[in-house]
């Protein structure tokens, strides 16, 4: 029996003009976009549509923008009926909305706070991330341990697909790895345009503040399993999910294991909802046999709704 998972991208997928095609052209999507504008303490629609102030790339704005775009697309889609959901890093919050663990309004407040805490904890230039291409996890882990010291660390942060591991930590060590990457055996080491050492143990400094903030919202058991970044398996219990969302701040994203877990459950169709096709590209490198669908635009929504 064929099974479907809906999946959601994380930071890096944002672009100016995102979701503008949905606004005023689809009632369900417009409702989500308007709700975001009414819930947040900044003009999110201006930031998403025109970004005249150049603030879309700041993590406290990027995070609610991506959640809003994915949630608007999700609201516009008919007859989805997924068996599972999964998101990459920030995208996991879109999966929580999809599975009704959090209301959209609560989720958008949470990711705004998550971004603010991340930005405050690490002023620009302290921490960073880079993608290591052409090495397996064990080798990357070994390199990270050899570069780290008592006062500076670098760690695997996103285990994305075979031959692509993202590392995170102090910028000085990220820069060193970028410089030495080829001599250490990597095909390439590419610095990422992010403002902090996300998914590394350095993020533990915000654990307490974030945990106490998210406790004030209503969390519900998931309507269908959410495959979590931290443990790469489906969860439905609200307390387990909430605890894992705190751990997610400072733990690696287990994307390969999560995808393989879903395939083991019988999933043969992944539907990526949100800007870009990054996750579809990763999944193709994990398993070439599964079906991949990308829903990014109003046209994609219309195509799905007409055909399904």
Curated annotation (Swiss-Prot):
Coiled coil: none
Family: Belongs to the FabD family.
Gene Ontology annotations of biological process type: fatty acid biosynthetic process
Originating organism: Staphylococcus aureus (strain MRSA252)
A GO MF label: [acyl-carrier-protein] S-malonyltransferase activity
Name of this protein: Malonyl CoA-acyl carrier protein transacylase
Pfam families: Acyl_transf_1
Enzyme class: transferase
Catalytic activity: holo-[ACP] + malonyl-CoA = malonyl-[ACP] + CoA
GO CC annotation terms, alphabetical: cytosol
Cleavable signal peptide: none
Metabolic or biological pathway: Lipid metabolism; fatty acid biosynthesis
EC number, UniProt record: 2.3.1.39
Record: active site: 89, 199
Keywords: Acyltransferase, Fatty acid biosynthesis, Fatty acid metabolism, Lipid biosynthesis, Lipid metabolism, Transferase
């Amino acid at each position: 029996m064929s099974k479907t998972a809906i999946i959601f991208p994380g930071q890096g997928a944002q672009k100016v003009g995102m979701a503008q095609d949905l606004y005023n052209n689809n009632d369900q999507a417009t409702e989500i976009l308007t709700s975001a504008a009414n819930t947040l303490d900044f003009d999110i629609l201006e930031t998403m549509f025109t970004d005249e102030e150049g603030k879309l790339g700041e993590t406290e704005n990027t995070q609610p923008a991506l959640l809003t775009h994915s949630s608007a697309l999700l609201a516009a889609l008919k007859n989805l009926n997924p068996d599972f959901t999964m998101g990459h890093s920030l995208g996991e919050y879109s999966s929580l909305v999809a599975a009704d663990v959090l209301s959209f309004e609560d989720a958008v407040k949470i990711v705004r706070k998550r971004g603010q805490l991340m930005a405050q904890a690490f002023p620009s230039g302290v921490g960073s991330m880079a993608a290591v291409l052409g090495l397996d996890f064990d080798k990357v882990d070994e390199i990270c341990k050899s570069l780290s010291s008592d006062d500076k660390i670098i760690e695997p942060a996103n285990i994305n697909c075979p031959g692509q591991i993202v590392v995170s930590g102090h910028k000085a060590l990220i820069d060193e790895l970028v410089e030495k990457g080829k001599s250490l055996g990597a095909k390439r080491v590419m610095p990422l345009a992010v403002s902090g050492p996300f998914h590394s143990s350095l993020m533990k400094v915000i654990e307490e503040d974030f945990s106490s903030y998210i406790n004030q919202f209503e969390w519900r058991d998931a309507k269908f399993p959410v495959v979590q970044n931290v443990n790469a398996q489906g969860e439905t219990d609200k307390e387990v999910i909430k605890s894992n969302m705190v751990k997610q701040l400072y733990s690696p994203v287990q994307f390969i294991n999560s995808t393989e877990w879903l395939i083991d459950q019988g999933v043969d169709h992944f539907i990526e909802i949100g800007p870009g096709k990054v996750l579809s590209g990763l999944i193709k490198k994990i398993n070439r046999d599964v079906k991949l669908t990308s829903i990014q635009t109003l046209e994609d929504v219309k195509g799905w709704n007409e055909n399904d």
